[in-house]
Structure formats: C-alpha cells, structure tokens
Amino acid sequence: SALAFPSHPKEIRYFPQQIHDLLGFLSNTLGEDHPFSSIQASPSISETYPEVWLLGSRYDSAMMAAQMGLPFAYAHFFGSGAHEGPAIVEGYRRNFQASNHLSEPLVNVGIHVLCAETEEQALKLASSRNLARLKSITGRAQGIPSVEDAQNFSYRNDELAFMEQYSRNCVDGDPQQVKNELYDLAERYETRDLSIVTICHAYEDRLRSSQLVAQ
C-alpha cells in the first residue's frame, strides 16, 4: 500500500516528500488528512524513535540533509571518495539548518575496509570485492566471487583501470596501515564517526577483519 502513494514512488522528485512523510510518521505528526495518518507502527512508537540519517555520495544529497536538518552519512565507498567527499561534507556543514531533529550538523562517513595480518593478504581478499563491484556496475552481478575466481578473471585494460580507481577509495591493508588510513580519513572529514563496510567472499575473513580493526 505504501508503494501505491504517490503513483511513481521511485522518481527522485518524490524523495524529499517521502522523507517528510517518514519523519512525520515516526514522530506521529502527520496531519489527519494525510493518507498515512491512520497507519500505526509496530512495535508502537512512543516518546522516542530511531534516528533518521540521510545517506548519499553527491552534493545534492548533502544539501537535502542540510536543509532538512538531518544527520548526513557520506558514502565514501560509493566512488567519489577522497577527491570530492570532504568538500561535499563541508558543504553540508556550511548550509545546515537546525531543526526539531538536530540542532547542529552531524556527519558519518562510510568506508570499505578490509584488514588482514599482512597487506598482501588483505589485497588478495579485496580482489573478490573489487570484481563483484565491477560486475555489479556492468550488469553481471553474481554475488561475491571467490578469491581464486577473482585472481583468475580475464580483465580488459579498461576494467583494470576501473579496479585501480575503485580500490583507491577503499582501506585495505594490515592493522597498522588500516589504523593510519582511518585516522587520516577521520581528520580529513573532521568526524570521529566512521561506518566500516567489509565485503569479501568468506565469512571467516570478514569476521577476522572486524576483529583486527577492533584491536
């Protein structure tokens, strides 16, 4: 039923209204004439409700979060990364308008991280993530390939160039390398709030990466 209103919910021009609808629904401030006013959340929402963050990787998303007075999560892992990211986040801070939800700008940065005992091992594990990304943007998504499949894959020159560019926005390495890069990114984005996204073929490697980062 939610997708039936409005008639074309996936069109970007409806997105700001959908955010307003969500905020109104969570805070129980929708007008009586609103189509969603009679819908009740389950479990019920009392005095508190989840924080609403706007995730994005472009200036438009940052400006929307700023104008609505919402926290902004910058998706460093989407690809714009280090070249545009800090400027986009600074634009959000500069244009932030206080709201009932937030009195001052709040920033989180999402980063691809793969940590292993050695840099060589981390880069090897990351090859399956990189291939998965390549296949995803070229319409050939098939999940996360094994490291063996990734290393035996026949890459064209343009695909190799893409992989090199994509990996620059990822933090892969041994524990000390990862720590140094995360601290550097936190400083450049002027935030201590980082979200780590770890994508690799084997669960054990993903778990070990998280354990090493936590140490």
Where is each model-derived feature located?
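Hydrophobic faces of well-ordered beta-strands that scaffold small-molecule active sites
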Residues: 51-55, 72-75, 105-112, 194-196
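A local structural motif
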Residues: 45-51
